[in-house]
């Protein structure tokens, strides 16, 4: 038997979250998964697009986190949209509960990765962006691209 791989292996990234939300802070949480979920996750068959986390009964749960059923699974295959429990310390859960109760703050998963063989989730405390914020981001990105393009052309000449 070989050793478990060291380091971080990214699996799924919620790229839309940085466009839709202002990220206030990040933290790492462990995931409670069943066997077929882990196998599907290792194959990269998951979607974080509409996922969000809630604090319920002193525990943190992720809802709308879709993990596709494992191809070689049988009748014991998992439900793709079942709520998944996150593993955090009690004081972190209490702090997140207080933050979640504030108006406008939400818990959004940013990415899923494997760290030393264990599934981890990068969770963010975020505030939803307004439409004008999104437009500003697009405009600044376009301006940055134009500047980079002009510098590149200037350096070629």
From Swiss-Prot:
Coiled-coil regions listed: none
InterPro entries assigned: SmpB, SsrA-bd_prot, SsrA-bd_prot_CS
A biological-process GO annotation: trans-translation
Superkingdom, taxonomy of origin: Bacteria
GO molecular function: RNA binding
Subcellular location, record wording: Cytoplasm
Recorded GO CC terms: cytosol
SUPFAM superfamilies reported for this sequence: Small protein B (SmpB) (SSF74982)
Disulfide bonds: none
Keywords assigned: Cytoplasm, RNA-binding
PROSITE patterns to which the protein is assigned, alphabetical: SSRP (PS01317)
HAMAP family in the record: SmpB
Function noted in UniProt: Required for rescue of stalled ribosomes mediated by trans-translation. Binds to transfer-messenger RNA (tmRNA), required for stable association of tmRNA with ribosomes. tmRNA and SmpB together mimic tRNA shape, replacing the anticodon stem-loop with SmpB. tmRNA is encoded by the ssrA gene; the 2 termini fold to resemble tRNA(Ala) and it encodes a 'tag peptide', a short internal open reading frame. During trans-translation Ala-aminoacylated tmRNA acts like a tRNA, entering the A-site of stalled ribosomes, displacing the stalled mRNA.
Membership in a protein family: Belongs to the SmpB family.
Official protein name in the record: SsrA-binding protein
Originating species: Syntrophomonas wolfei subsp. wolfei (strain DSM 2245B / Goettingen)
């Amino acid at each position: 038997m070989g050793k478990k791989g060291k380091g971080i292996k990214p699996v799924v990234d919620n790229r839309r979250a940085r466009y839709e939300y202002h990220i206030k802070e990040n933290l790492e949480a462990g995931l409670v998964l069943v066997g077929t979920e882990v196998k599907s996750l290792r194959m990269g068959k998951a979607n974080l697009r509409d996922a969000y986390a809630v604090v319920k009964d002193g525990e943190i749960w992720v809802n709308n986190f879709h993990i596709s059923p494992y191809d070689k699974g049988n009748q014991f295959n998992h439900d793709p949209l079942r709520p998944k429990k996150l593993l955090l310390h009690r004081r972190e859960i209490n702090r997140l509960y207080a933050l979640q109760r504030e108006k406008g703050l939400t818990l959004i998963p940013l990415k899923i990765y494997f760290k030393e063989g264990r599934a981890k989730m990068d969770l963010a405390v975020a505030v939803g962006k307004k439409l004008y914020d999104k437009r500003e981001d697009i405009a600044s990105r376009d301006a940055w691209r134009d500047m980079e393009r002009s510098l590149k052309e200037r350096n070629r000449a």
